[in-house]
């Protein structure tokens, strides 16, 4: 009986290691609580500058209305790029991938991503989750 348990545990651990090795490079970069009033200074500052090639946006706890987004790179000139984002994200919905670093300079690292927008159709503040892929 003990050997059956040991074999089962070994198989479970092997499966976990196998799946971890094949995991993608998608990482939750952070989340922003979206106020009910339109705000244009919502920022996600990355504590460690990281190379991010594309992002996805996801809404939790309510619907979001977005009017703009920009990504800022760590560079001497504080380079930035405006992002083409959807104007609305429904609760539980995740956007398609949004490409950044599109000027073929994939070595620039992202220091901050800013958003303009607010929560709609909810008494709670919705949460905007930002998922990155490097």
From Swiss-Prot:
Residues 1-23 form the signal peptide. Keywords: Signal. Disulfide bonds: none annotated. Pfam families: DUF2541. Belongs to the UPF0412 family. This is UPF0412 protein YaaI. It comes from Escherichia coli (strain K12). The lineage of its organism: Bacteria, Pseudomonadati, Pseudomonadota, Gammaproteobacteria, Enterobacterales. The gene is yaaI.
